[in-house]
């Protein structure tokens, strides 16, 4: 007898790869096991779409992904990664707009501005909101109290009361003034007093935790180096003045540690705020990862200062992307929306990102309150996110990886290495060098 003519062909199992390493997600103790749980749950519920988790150490991830893409073997889903992590692969991400339309995926669950942040001109909708990292001012209340200063404002738009009772805007000019009052030498003199010794400082009013020149300037005025013609590199309006503010803070007004001081062990080797000897520092929500044990519960957050009456809230945002060369884009989108949806609660906890959905934010901050029980004013973080500015400090530049390395490894350190006429240096050295790097991409 012959076989049955009515046999049904087996359904093909689609194999997907999820590549982790361009951003967070590589910690083998706290992150990889949870990501594997997320994959296992998906695989159990979706026998016809099986996912393999591929975790590559951050230091190797860029080269690994470049090699895979060049060999025609790209992973399907990549992330979490921020703007900087993904810009090194410009033109290699899939436009999600057709998939969003075909799946009738509901974009109204996200703020419109958050969706637009992942829409790249000429490239399409390259991602959807997931983990957000708004920026604001970290501060140590006890140092304000010891100096007899009022604490920073608790709401955007509120003014600050100076020691003489004058009400002033919470601005970068104000940060300079109170930063000097909060900077103290070994004799107890602050940086405004006669006889203050800048070589014997025991407490600084301000320190800039990590980040680099684009972020530093973006907190004064949003902008990007690449101009509208897609070729010309220029410093956005206000950025040179912002960089001069930081240089003066270190070498003229002395309320911020310079590069040499910051590198010392007693000043945190590049992360000074957690030493407990720094009054203020501007950063993002992800910085809660790295506050150490010395501060204890003696820290809180305040609004981003204004500049010329305008507040610029730079936003870091991580999400997932689909490789343009994925052989299974429809299935990859299904898995990606699972990461953005059902699996997001687990993932956001291990990534430290604020949920893009407003409905999920209170639960997220409740978990942070368990870790930091002093009553952090998380309404500041929510307001910073709701009023985030664009373009991102991590905006695209041609030859991005080389350009970024030059900006962060060469230019940024110079801003706090020695007293500098920033305008001259930017005009005569920095911008020509950055333009030459961008031109190499042609």
Model-predicted segments: where are they?
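Short, solvent-exposed loop/beta-turn-alpha elements that line the ligand-binding surface or hinge
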Residues: 97-110, 153-167, 196-204, 223-242, ...
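Hinge/lid segment of periplasmic solute-binding proteins
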Residues: 57, 81-136, 145, 195-199, ...
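Extracytoplasmic/periplasmic substrate-recognition and gating elements
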Residues: 50, 123, 143, 147, ...
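Extracytoplasmic/periplasmic solute-binding protein
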Residues: 121-131, 135, 163-232
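Conserved C-terminal helix/tail region of periplasmic/extracytoplasmic solute-binding proteins
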Residues: 366-374, 385-442
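Conserved N-terminal structural module of periplasmic/extracytoplasmic solute-binding proteins
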Residues: 1-90, 101-108, 147, 151-152, ...
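Short helix-initiation/N-cap motifs at beta->coil->alpha
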Residues: 55-64, 168-174, 258-274
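Glycine-centered hinge/linker elements that transmit conformational signals in sensory
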Residues: 176-180, 214-218, 228-263, 304
């Amino acid at each position: 007898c012959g076989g049955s003519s009515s046999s049904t062909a087996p359904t093909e199992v689609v194999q997907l790869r999820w590549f982790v390493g361009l951003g967070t997600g590589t910690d083998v103790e706290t992150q990889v096991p949870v990501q594997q749980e997320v994959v296992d749950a998906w695989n159990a519920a979706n026998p016809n779409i099986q996912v393999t988790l591929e975790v590559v150490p951050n230091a190797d991830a860029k080269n690994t992904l470049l090699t895979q893409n060049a060999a025609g073997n790209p992973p399907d889903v990549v992330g979490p990664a921020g703007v900087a992590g993904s810009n090194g692969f410009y033109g290699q991400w899939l436009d999600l707009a057709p998939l969003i339309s075909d799946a009738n995926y509901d974009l109204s669950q996200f703020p419109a501005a958050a969706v637009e942040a992942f829409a790249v001109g000429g490239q399409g909708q390259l991602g959807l909101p997931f983990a957000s990292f708004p920026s604001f001012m970290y501060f140590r209340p006890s140092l304000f109290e010891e100096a007899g200063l009022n604490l920073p404002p608790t709401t955007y738009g509120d003014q600050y009361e100076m020691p003489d009772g004058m009400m002033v805007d919470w601005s970068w000019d104000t940060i300079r003034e109170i930063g000097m009052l909060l900077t103290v030498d070994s004799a107890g003199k602050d940086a405004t007093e006669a006889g203050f010794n800048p070589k014997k400082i025991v407490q600084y009013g301000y320190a800039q935790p990590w980040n680099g020149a684009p972020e530093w300037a973006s907190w004064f005025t949003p902008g990007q180096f690449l101009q509208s013609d897609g070729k010309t590199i220029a410093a956005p309006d206000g950025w040179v003045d912002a960089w001069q503010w930081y240089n003066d803070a270190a070498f003229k007004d002395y309320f911020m540690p310079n590069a040499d001081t910051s590198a010392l062990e007693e000043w945190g080797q590049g992360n000074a705020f957690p030493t407990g000897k720094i009054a203020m520092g501007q950063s993002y929500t992800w910085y809660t990862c790295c506050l150490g044990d010395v501060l204890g519960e003696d820290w809180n957050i305040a609004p981003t200062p204004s500049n010329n009456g305008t507040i610029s809230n730079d936003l870091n945002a991580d999400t997932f992307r689909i490789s343009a060369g994925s052989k299974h884009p429809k299935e990859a989108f299904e898995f990606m929306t699972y990461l953005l949806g059902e699996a997001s609660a687990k993932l956001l906890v291990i990534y430290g990102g604020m949920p893009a959905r407003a409905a999920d934010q209170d639960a997220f901050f409740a978990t942070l309150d368990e870790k930091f029980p002093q009553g952090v004013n998380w309404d500041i973080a929510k307001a910073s996110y709701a009023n985030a500015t664009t373009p991102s400090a991590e905006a695209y530049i041609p030859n991005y990886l080389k350009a970024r390395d030059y900006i962060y490894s060469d230019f940024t350190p110079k801003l706090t290495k020695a007293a500098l006429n920033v305008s001259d240096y930017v005009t005569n050295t920095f911008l020509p060098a950055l333009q030459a790097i961008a031109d190499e991409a042609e």
